[in-house]
Amino acid sequence: AQSVFEVDCMGLLNIAKTLNSGKDLAGNDLDEPTNFYIGATGNPGAPDLEIERQKLAAKIKNGAHFVQTQPIYDLEQAKRYIDKMSEFDVPIMLGLIPLKSFKMATYLHEKVPGINLTQEILDRVEKGGKEAGTEIAIETLEQIKKIAAGVHIMPLNDIDTTLHIINHV
């Protein structure tokens, strides 16, 4: 089987925006407009934040109401991203994945574009495993509260740890 990509992210945003305006994709009036709250992605770890800013401008033009980012572990990087995107009147929710192991942390850092773990975090998770990863998530969430509109936690099937993090904060 082959994947079929008939619509890219900008096209999908535009479709939702069009439906919210009360039109279908052929331009016909809908009985009622939809009321989608349209989200888009952002990447604080992008190598060029100016290009990322231009992408976000296009996403907002095409209907995005809010942004959810890649997971962040470098708060200075997150602050630079928030500052660079401050011209836009959309809430930015920073992503957070609680680290379960050193293997997971290393994989995210080395293999997933836009996810950058500091050496301090890698060292802590190497020594303390999942417990250290949970502590880092709590500390990171405390800082996110100060700089962003919110956070979206990606629990990766570990609801108990996520609840522990939320209850701590």
Predicted regions and their residues:
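A short secondary-structure junction signal
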Residues: L49-K55, P71, K79-Y81
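Active-site glycine-rich loop that binds ribose-phosphate moieties when present
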Residues: D24-G27, P47-N62
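Catalytic beta/alpha-barrel core
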Residues: H65-D74, G150-P155
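Non-catalytic positions within long, well-ordered alpha-helices that form the structural scaffold/packing
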Residues: I60, I144-K145
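Conserved, mostly hydrophobic/aromatic
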Residues: K59, G63, L94, V151
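C-terminal helical cap(s) of enzyme catalytic domains, especially alpha/beta-barrels
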Residues: A1, F5, L12-L13, A78-I82, ...
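Active-site pocket-lining/capping segments in soluble small-molecule metabolic enzymes
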Residues: S3-D31, T41-A46, E87-T140, N157
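Flavin-dependent oxidoreductase catalytic cores
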Residues: F36, R124-K127, H168
